[in-house]
Amino acid sequence: MPIGSAPTPSPEPVLVCGTVRSVQELRPRRGMTILKVLIADDSGAVELTWFNQPFKKKLFHVGMDVAAFGKIEWAYGRRQMNSPDTEQGGLSQEQGFVP
């Protein structure tokens, strides 16, 4: 589903595909990390967020295609998915998404 046409907020989890635009790791305080990955397509963008999972930063790099499955929320003026399931490389029509 194009990111821009996904319902926000989504009552059910949705599958969106996009290209990684940025990867950012924040450390707001000792013992806490927040990983934010911005993915976008022609219709819009969504920020994927994980808490205390810094190892996931190695899985993403700018320019790669990603499929994300989760509930979309509207937070801080943008679409956001918290702790979504992801697949690197996006999805083709023949593939299914395995969480």
Regions found by a protein language model. Give the residues of each.
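OB-fold nucleic-acid-binding modules
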Residues: 1-16, 20-21
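Upstream accessory/linker segments immediately N-terminal to the RecA-like ATPase cores of bacterial MutS
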Residues: 6-12, 26-99
